């Protein structure tokens, strides 16, 4: 415990909790203070001026990060026939129909992202209580209910990140690894912030983006100067 406390103290050394850091400066600080033996995930959190309890203030979408996420994503596809073959050829890890529904209903979820063809949704709909709480339920709004399964699989494998606002009005996502260079992380974060901004719902009033922060798995949370998130 003493070692952990010492490491936490060291990572926060010199960090001003009241300062809004420029994006590049914040990322350099996170990289410089990484002292663990694994490649930490860099995560961005955006506090939005919405109340997701109201349907017209829901924020949801998907963004393709230009430099990927740095993590291996296992993709499951619910499809039959030619579409199942297309999914396999595109690199899907698990492909099935009724058999895959049965497996998931029994509680075996050996994947990170789920795609379905439209004709499979009556079956996949039975899995709402299992996949819904995990944020894995296929949805046409984020491109995971589609006839173009090959493109969806490749996007999922290549850096597609889904986002959805939580009860407190916060939307967050992993946007890369500490091992990424600063430029790659900046590009990913700007792409994410831009996607969230464009997903502003009609019911949102007043200041939409209230606060943005960036952190790493074991690192400090740094408040960002929102003006530095705009594409340069």
From Swiss-Prot:
One of the protein's GO biological processes: regulation of translation
Keyword terms of this UniProt record: Repressor, Ribonucleoprotein, Ribosomal protein, RNA-binding, rRNA-binding, Translation regulation, tRNA-binding
Signal peptide: none
PROSITE patterns recorded: RIBOSOMAL_L1
GO cellular component term of the entry, any: cytosolic large ribosomal subunit
Disulphide bridges: none
Gene Ontology molecular function: rRNA binding; structural constituent of ribosome; tRNA binding
InterPro entries: Ribosom_uL1_bac-type (IPR005878), Ribosomal_uL1 (IPR002143), Ribosomal_uL1-like (IPR023674), Ribosomal_uL1/biogenesis (IPR028364), Ribosomal_uL1_3-a/b-sand (IPR016095), Ribosomal_uL1_CS (IPR023673)
Gene3D superfamilies documented for this protein: 3.30.190.20, 3.40.50.790
UniProt function note: Binds directly to 23S rRNA. The L1 stalk is quite mobile in the ribosome, and is involved in E site tRNA release. Protein L1 is also a translational repressor protein, it controls the translation of the L11 operon by binding to its mRNA.
Family stated for the protein in its record: Belongs to the universal ribosomal protein uL1 family.
Assembly notes: Part of the 50S ribosomal subunit.
Protein name (Swiss-Prot/TrEMBL): Large ribosomal subunit protein uL1
Native source organism of the sequence: Mesorhizobium japonicum (strain LMG 29417 / CECT 9101 / MAFF 303099) (Mesorhizobium loti (strain MAFF 303099))
